[in-house]
């Protein structure tokens, strides 16, 4: 896979990876640039969160906005135009991926923002006896209702770009294990991550999955996409795997599960 390094800042901060995508004109690149993650380097700032700028077949797609306006500031330094984004996608309803949605809407006056239908202001993490709110910025769903599109089931944004929900049963047990909850009808229930979705691109090498946290399990997500497109190869998965709080044994098990899927590229 070729690697494009555009300047010293990008070289230090990230590697922009190109996966060729076939169209009538031959092969055009898909370029994914990390705008924000938890690593700061040089002029680029970092924070607990993620935002990825994806260029595909002449369209610009933003995945998540991170936890502050740093995604937009880094985008300017990386010469990526937030104003030129055609479509925005929210991976899941947690603050570190959504808190700067308002910043995006203020900078971009036209792109729809795709959220899974399960996204509400109701995500919490439990520590001891306390439930801490970790969800969407308050009132974002009403303040920008005209810019938000809710997705249900398998959803095609444009040809070759898809949003895929979880299809693995009983994911509420993941919520139980991770002490993540949703509040519904004045009661606490384990989060089943019905608000999480995968952003999938069809490329010449195969399907490429972007999932910012993989709360539902990275191997589950690979298998979900594979089952959705049974005649196509799942080539790669890019994003966050939420392994920072896992034991060495748990991480080894996840690595083996990923290997068992037969996927070629992991980032």
Predicted segments, located by residue:
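Cap/insert and terminal regions of metallo-dependent hydrolase folds
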Residues: 95-97, 190-267
């Amino acid at each position: 896979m070729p690697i494009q390094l555009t300047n010293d800042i990008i070289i230090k901060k990230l590697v922009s990876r190109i996966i060729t995508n076939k169209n009538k004109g031959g092969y055009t690149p898909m370029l994914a640039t990390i705008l924000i993650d938890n690593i700061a380097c040089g002029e680029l700032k970092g924070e607990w969160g993620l935002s990825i700028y994806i260029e595909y077949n002449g369209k610009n797609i933003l995945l998540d906005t991170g936890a502050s306006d740093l995604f937009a500031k880094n985008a300017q330094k990386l010469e990526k135009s937030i104003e030129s984004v055609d479509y925005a996608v929210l991976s899941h309803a947690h603050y570190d991926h959504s808190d700067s949605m308002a910043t995006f809407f203020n900078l971009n006056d036209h792109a729809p923002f795709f959220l899974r239908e399960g996204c509400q202001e109701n995500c919490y993490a439990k520590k001891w006896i306390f439930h801490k709110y970790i969800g969407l910025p308050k009132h974002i769903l009403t303040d920008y209702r005209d810019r938000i599109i809710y997705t249900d089931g398998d959803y095609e944004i444009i040809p070759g770009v898809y949003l895929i929900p979880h299809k693995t049963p009983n994911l509420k047990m993941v919520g139980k294990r991770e002490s993540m909850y949703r509040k519904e009808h004045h009661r606490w229930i384990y989060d089943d991550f019905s608000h999480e979705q995968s952003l999938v691109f069809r490329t010449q090498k195969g399907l490429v999955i972007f999932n910012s946290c993989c709360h539902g399990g990275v191997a589950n997500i690979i298998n979900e996409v594979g089952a959705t497109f049974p005649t196509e190869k799942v080539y790669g998965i890019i994003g966050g795997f939420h392994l920072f709080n896992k034991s060495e044994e748990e991480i080894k098990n996840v690595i083996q599960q990923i290997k068992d899927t037969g996927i070629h590229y992991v980032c």
